[in-house]
């Protein structure tokens, strides 16, 4: 999913810059609206939803939600005034990073998968850098923008006191 890598990125930023302010923007009614506050971060919701690739007529309400999300994202970005915007490929990344980029705010994408998601592919052109987990992502993104970082991992997973043998037995 997108939530835990995003929280891991936020945690890393807070470790490096403890006084930094971080605001998440998520899709209303989705898991991030509970998980992000549980991780200690504020979140604003957008009514955005994914497109139905099989039945185009079902996308009329989705388009209306997208336009509304674009307007709300603009207000959120204007009010928060971020120095940068990071997208991890979730539905809310689209309108939020599109608006941030159009306002001259540097955008960064993080792609967790070996096959790039639709949102990240659409945002790639305006992104300043694209962090990827796998080699060979040049087939989706400009080689000059790619940074091979691997996937962000939650601190609790990397600081485990469980041995490899115990983990395999679980």
Question: Residue spans of the language-model regions?
Answer:
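Short amphipathic alpha-helix
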Residues: 2-14
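Glycosyltransferases and closely related glycan-assembly transferases
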Residues: 72-86, 92-108, 121-126
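Residue-level signature of catalytic and energy-coupling elements of molecular machines
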Residues: 1, 36, 89, 114, ...
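Active-site-proximal region of nucleotide-activated glycan assembly enzymes
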Residues: 31, 42, 101-168
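Alpha-helical segments flanking ligand/cofactor-binding loops in enzyme cores
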Residues: 11, 34, 98, 120-121
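Conserved nucleotide-sugar phosphate-binding/catalytic loop shared by glycosyltransferases and other
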Residues: 15-65, 70, 143, 147-154
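Glycine-rich, highly charged phosphate/nucleotide-binding loops
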Residues: 61-78, 160, 164-166
């Amino acid at each position: 999913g997108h939530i835990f890598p995003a929280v891991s990125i936020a945690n890393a930023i807070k470790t490096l810059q403890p006084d930094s302010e971080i605001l998440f923007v998520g899709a209303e009614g989705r898991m991030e609206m509970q998980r992000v506050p549980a991780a200690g971060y504020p979140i604003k919701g957008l009514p955005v939803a994914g497109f139905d690739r099989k039945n185009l007529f079902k996308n009329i309400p989705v388009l209306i939600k997208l336009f509304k999300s674009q307007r709300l994202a603009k207000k959120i970005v204007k009010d928060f005034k971020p120095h940068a915007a990071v997208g991890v490929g979730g539905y809310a990344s689209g309108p939020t990073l599109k608006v941030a980029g159009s306002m001259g705010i540097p955008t960064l994408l993080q792609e967790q998968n070996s096959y790039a998601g639709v949102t990240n592919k659409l945002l790639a052109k305006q992104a300043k850098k694209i962090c990827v987990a796998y080699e060979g992502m040049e087939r989706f993104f400009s080689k000059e923008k790619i940074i091979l970082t691997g996937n962000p991992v939650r601190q609790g997973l990397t600081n485990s006191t469980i041995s490899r043998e115990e983990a395999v037995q679980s």
